[in-house]
């Protein structure tokens, strides 16, 4: 995963919130939606950047991943939600989908092969 030389990286959005806050969000669909959106963004970025990975979850559905995270967070309430997802992805590494075709993917993507015409300012 991408990080600085010490292994640190900035966490944005719901990923910086605690597992305890994730657990409490089960009763609030708007709050839970923020965690679900963060999870989808994390997985999309991981899929795009991790070598040999098309879908980090493999055959696991998004709802099953959320259920796994509920269990993890119940036991690790002080961990960040980002750390919980990292543990999920590490645990699923051997079951990940390595190429397109099949799987529980909700979409598809392809890395850009050419530099953009204009740099983003």
Descriptions of predicted regions:
Residues 2-4:
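Boundary at the C-terminal end of the N-terminal hydrophobic targeting segment
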Residues 7-71, 75:
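Short N-proximal segments of mature Sec-exported proteins
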